[in-house]
Amino acid sequence: MKTIIISDFDETITRVDTICTIAKLPYLLNPRLKPEWGHFTKTYMDGYHKYKYNGTRSLPLLSSGVPTIISQSNFNKLFADELKYQNHNRVVELNSVNEITKQQIFKSISLDQMKTFARDQNHEDCLLRDGFKTFCSSVVKNFESDFYVLSINWSKEFIHEVIGDRRLKNSHIFCNDLKKVSDKCSQSYNGEFDCRLLTGSDKVKILGEILDKIDSGCNKEGNSCSYWYIGDSETDLLSILHPSTNGVLLINPQENPSKFIKITEKIIGIPKDKISSFEADNGPAWLQFCEKEGGKGAYLVKSWDSLKDLIMQVTKM
């Protein structure tokens, strides 16, 4: 059985949100560039309040009324409100990226400039979370075919350079990509965004498309696949809970306790006793918090090293 890894990028593979890092590039290349980045931060927050969701977001996601096993037949019904909430957030995100497009902040920046910038920012792999490279060499048998990135980041070129493995296919990176100038002779950005991947609902939709395409290929070859989706934030939760994946929420509670509690207790609804056990210094490195059809599950995992051990244990079952 092939193990397929589909991972978020920012704060899952990386230590920080690198969208903020990418935002520095236009101003490094042109220190006199206007408007300053604070303008776009304000635009985002203004849009967040202006387009605030007025519907019902049913939290926690795993309430007492949720069946113990998530399946293809009940997923859309169980998480209908969350799908609507995440889809509504497209309005907020579009308001923000449309302003960046309007101001042409990234227009004419070359792909080579982005690649060089990414390598400089990731000097000695400083952007990568501990254990990621070891995980890839130990778990991913064929990086060219078995590893995917699904992110709301802005640049395939940036993602590719930071991960740093030349075997990673460009076609296996899915993100809110900066568009390129249509002239094939010009390797630069035109200042616009793809805008297909902005929210958690976009992620789970594209995840389904990825799984369908891989399944089609595996069936032709007579193979079967085990899918793992790894993420760290609210935009990853629908993909983590998707019935076709073993889902992983990759957060170390010691490193980011407020984020951990918000997502695990308030949004997902994991029982406090399980959370307390996982939070402890001597607690487990990983913990299953829900079941899915076919023996799959969703897990809390503290690190890439712990995830390596979990996958190896699960694949031996």
From Swiss-Prot:
PANTHER family with a match to the protein in the record: COLD TOLERANCE PROTEIN 1, UPF0655 PROTEIN YCR015C
Homology family: Belongs to the CTO1 family.
Function: Protein required for cold tolerance. Plays a role in the regulation of phosphate uptake.
Gene3D superfamilies named in the record: HAD superfamily/HAD-like (3.40.50.1000)
SUPFAM superfamilies, per database record: HAD-like
Protein name according to UniProt: Cold tolerance protein 1
Gene Ontology biological-process annotations: phosphate ion transport
One Gene Ontology term of the molecular function aspect: thiamine phosphate phosphatase activity
Domain of life: Eukaryota
